[in-house]
């Protein structure tokens, strides 16, 4: 880690310097220059039906291909959550017409560069640094999407121009946005290069009818072609103008939800060269700093001799912080942050830490094994049609002892319904989870071999377990 000890970022000299010695957390904002120079501060989800071009749009804006895994490339679908950061610039020459004065680049681009548009002068200046959470668009992966949605400030809803609207998953995703209370939505009518103008207009009417009465009502509809990069600068302009910068809490104790974790050591590495595990996630609040002592809950879960669950939180120290390829001295909420720790790498490999919560020592919430929730069920199963019937299948009521999949933060775990009333339920979780009263959870049930979203709930109270701590 170059320069990690001195508390000053030495990597990427063309970006704004971060110095821990002069850091005053109370003065930071999501648009502070030294923050957005190196990391994203706004999370935007891309949602929509499979193969409508979500990953392509992200690639057109950020230059990053979010599909990272071999099986995803072969099938051309996104399975895990993909993240990509993009910097949005605005030209400081007032004579340049909109939308040409907006531009997007990758996250390692300098904060200012001269214009290359003929007839204009001045520089492109950094105005926003956004992170795109590329959500998988398949039914089975609805859970992953709700997990990703825990850290979304706004959404781009993609609708392909060459198919009728709405496709089944489009409505399912819109329901997920409503659950997550996302208010800021841009609708992108993609693949516009494949259809005639009359078709595009006809579909525009369909989209208007489809979003009426939902959170997306009144959202701007922008026709684009992600492959040909048509109108991408309009999308950039709308991101800057229509999506307000979310209010962030920089002064609380930091908390990060782990979405990915990995072991960065190559096989055959010498013992002295071993590096600690890396956890990737989005910070909900507070600021993480290099050198800070951290705690990870629930930590290592095991059972004692009587078969009772035990949790042993992991204590460690941050040795490095990254946002894509930019190294940081401190990380603020927004975007995917990689946290290099001194945790045993075997605990982190292959996403083993997903669903855990990382934060300042002693400031993390309780660990729950049972939850009492107030819940709401959807009236109909989204996207599932019953045989011979045009309408979607009805959602059956919760029954005692049935097993559901519960999504809390980034954790998906099984839960058995132990008691149920009109709108209250008790759920015994298979895995303990670190969460708080008032948090939202999503409920899915197995329907025809797939997990389908059936509703959501809010935690009222629950049974907590005391974490065990070694005496040494």
Swiss-Prot record:
<dbReference type="GO" id="GO:0002183">
    <property type="term" value="P:cytoplasmic translational initiation"/>
</dbReference>
<dbReference type="GO" id="GO:0005850">
    <property type="term" value="C:eukaryotic translation initiation factor 2 complex"/>
</dbReference>
<feature type="modified residue" description="N-acetylalanine">
    <location>
        <position position="2"/>
    </location>
</feature>
<dbReference type="GO" id="GO:0003924">
    <property type="term" value="F:GTPase activity"/>
</dbReference>
<keyword id="KW-0547">Nucleotide-binding</keyword>
<dbReference type="GO" id="GO:0005525">
    <property type="term" value="F:GTP binding"/>
</dbReference>
<dbReference type="GO" id="GO:0005829">
    <property type="term" value="C:cytosol"/>
</dbReference>
<feature type="region of interest" description="G2">
    <location>
        <begin position="76"/>
        <end position="80"/>
    </location>
</feature>
<feature type="binding site">
    <location>
        <begin position="225"/>
        <end position="227"/>
    </location>
    <ligand>
        <name>GTP</name>
    </ligand>
</feature>
<feature type="binding site">
    <location>
        <begin position="51"/>
        <end position="56"/>
    </location>
    <ligand>
        <name>GTP</name>
    </ligand>
</feature>
<feature type="domain" description="tr-type G">
    <location>
        <begin position="39"/>
        <end position="248"/>
    </location>
</feature>
<dbReference type="Pfam" id="PF03144">
    <property type="entry name" value="GTP_EFTU_D2"/>
</dbReference>
<dbReference type="GO" id="GO:0008135">
    <property type="term" value="F:translation factor activity, RNA binding"/>
</dbReference>
<feature type="binding site">
    <location>
        <begin position="190"/>
        <end position="193"/>
    </location>
    <ligand>
        <name>GTP</name>
    </ligand>
</feature>
<dbReference type="InterPro" id="IPR027417">
    <property type="entry name" value="P-loop_NTPase"/>
</dbReference>
<keyword id="KW-0378">Hydrolase</keyword>
<keyword id="KW-0963">Cytoplasm</keyword>
<dbReference type="GO" id="GO:0006413">
    <property type="term" value="P:translational initiation"/>
</dbReference>
<comment type="similarity">
    <text>Belongs to the TRAFAC class translation factor GTPase superfamily. Classic translation factor GTPase family. EIF2G subfamily.</text>
</comment>
<dbReference type="GO" id="GO:1990856">
    <property type="term" value="F:methionyl-initiator methionine tRNA binding"/>
</dbReference>
<protein>
    <recommendedName>
        <fullName>Eukaryotic translation initiation factor 2 subunit 3</fullName>
        <ecNumber>3.6.5.3</ecNumber>
    </recommendedName>
</protein>
<keyword id="KW-0597">Phosphoprotein</keyword>
<keyword id="KW-0342">GTP-binding</keyword>
<dbReference type="Pfam" id="PF09173">
    <property type="entry name" value="eIF2_C"/>
</dbReference>
<keyword id="KW-0396">Initiation factor</keyword>
<feature type="region of interest" description="G3">
    <location>
        <begin position="134"/>
        <end position="137"/>
    </location>
</feature>
<feature type="region of interest" description="Interacts with CDC123">
    <location>
        <begin position="457"/>
        <end position="469"/>
    </location>
</feature>
<dbReference type="InterPro" id="IPR004161">
    <property type="entry name" value="EFTu-like_2"/>
</dbReference>
<feature type="modified residue" description="Phosphoserine">
    <location>
        <position position="16"/>
    </location>
</feature>
<dbReference type="Pfam" id="PF00009">
    <property type="entry name" value="GTP_EFTU"/>
</dbReference>
<comment type="function">
    <text>Member of the eIF2 complex that functions in the early steps of protein synthesis by forming a ternary complex with GTP and initiator tRNA. This complex binds to a 40S ribosomal subunit, followed by mRNA binding to form the 43S pre-initiation complex (43S PIC). Junction of the 60S ribosomal subunit to form the 80S initiation complex is preceded by hydrolysis of the GTP bound to eIF2 and release of an eIF2-GDP binary complex. In order for eIF2 to recycle and catalyze another round of initiation, the GDP bound to eIF2 must exchange with GTP by way of a reaction catalyzed by eIF-2B.</text>
</comment>
<dbReference type="InterPro" id="IPR044127">
    <property type="entry name" value="eIF2g_dom_2"/>
</dbReference>
<dbReference type="InterPro" id="IPR044128">
    <property type="entry name" value="eIF2g_GTP-bd"/>
</dbReference>
<keyword id="KW-0648">Protein biosynthesis</keyword>
<dbReference type="GO" id="GO:0003743">
    <property type="term" value="F:translation initiation factor activity"/>
</dbReference>
<comment type="subunit">
    <text>Eukaryotic translation initiation factor 2 eIF2 is a heterotrimeric complex composed of an alpha (EIF2S1), a beta (EIF2S2) and a gamma (EIF2S3) chain. eIF2 is member of the 43S pre-initiation complex (43S PIC). Interacts (via C-terminus) with CDC123; the interaction is direct.</text>
</comment>
<feature type="region of interest" description="G5">
    <location>
        <begin position="225"/>
        <end position="227"/>
    </location>
</feature>
<dbReference type="InterPro" id="IPR050543">
    <property type="entry name" value="eIF2G"/>
</dbReference>
<feature type="region of interest" description="G1">
    <location>
        <begin position="48"/>
        <end position="55"/>
    </location>
</feature>
<dbReference type="InterPro" id="IPR009000">
    <property type="entry name" value="Transl_B-barrel_sf"/>
</dbReference>
<dbReference type="GO" id="GO:0001731">
    <property type="term" value="P:formation of translation preinitiation complex"/>
</dbReference>
<feature type="region of interest" description="G4">
    <location>
        <begin position="190"/>
        <end position="193"/>
    </location>
</feature>
């Amino acid at each position: 880690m170059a320069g990690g000890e001195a508390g000053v970022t030495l990597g990427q000299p063309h970006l704004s310097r971060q110095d821990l010695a002069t850091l005053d957390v109370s003065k930071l904002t999501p648009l502070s220059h030294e923050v957005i120079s190196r990391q994203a501060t706004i999370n935007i989800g891309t949602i929509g039906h499979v193969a409508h071009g979500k990953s392509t749009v992200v690639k057109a804006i950020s230059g990053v291909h979010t599909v990272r895994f071999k099986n995803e490339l072969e099938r051309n679908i996104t399975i895990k959550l993909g993240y990509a950061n993009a910097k949005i610039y605005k030209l400081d020459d007032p004579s340049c017409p909109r939308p040409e004065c907006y531009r997007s680049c990758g996250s390692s681009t300098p904060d200012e560069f001269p214009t290359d548009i003929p007839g204009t002068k001045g520089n492109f200046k950094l105005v926003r640094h956004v992170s795109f959470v590329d959500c998988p668009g398949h039914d089975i992966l609805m859970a992953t999407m709700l997990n990703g949605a825990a850290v979304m400030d706004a959404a781009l809803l993609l609708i392909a121009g060459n198919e009728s609207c709405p496709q089944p998953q489009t409505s399912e995703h819109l329901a997920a946005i409503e659950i997550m209370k996302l208010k800021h939505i841009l609708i992108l009518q993609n693949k516009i290069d494949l259809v005639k103008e009359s078709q595009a207009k006809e579909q525009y009417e369909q989209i208007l009818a489809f979003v009426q009465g939902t959170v997306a009502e009144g959202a701007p509809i922008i026709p684009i072609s992600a492959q040909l990069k048509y109108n991408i600068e309009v999308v950039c302009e709308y991101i800057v103008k229509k999506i307000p910068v979310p209010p962030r809490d920089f002064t609380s104790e930091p908390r990060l939800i782990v979405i990915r974790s990995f072991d960065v050591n190559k096989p055959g590495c010498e013992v002295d060269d071993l590096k600690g595990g890396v956890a990737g996630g989005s910070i909900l609040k507070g600021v993480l700093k290099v050198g800070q002592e951290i705690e990870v809950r629930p930590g290592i879960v095991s059972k004692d001799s009587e078969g009772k669950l035990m949790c042993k939180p992991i204590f460690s120290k941050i040795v490095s912080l990254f946002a894509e390829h930019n190294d940081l001295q401190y990380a603020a909420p927004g975007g995917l942050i990689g946290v290099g720790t001194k945790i045993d790498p075997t605990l982190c490999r292959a996403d083993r830490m997903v669903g855990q919560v990382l934060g300042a020592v002693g400031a993390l919430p309780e660990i729950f094994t049972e939850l009492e929730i107030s819940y709401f069920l959807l009236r109909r199963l989204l996207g599932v049609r019953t045989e011979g019937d045009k309408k979607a299948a009805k959602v059956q009521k919760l029954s005692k002892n049935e097993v559901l999949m519960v999504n809390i933060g980034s954790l998906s775990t099984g839960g058995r319904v132990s008691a149920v009333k009109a709108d209250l339920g008790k759920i015994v979780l298979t895995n303990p989870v670190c969460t708080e009263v008032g948090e939202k959870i999503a409920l899915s049930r197995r329907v025809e071999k797939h997990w389908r979203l059936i509703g959501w709930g809010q935690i009222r109270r629950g049974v907590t377990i005391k974490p065990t701590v070694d005496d040494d």
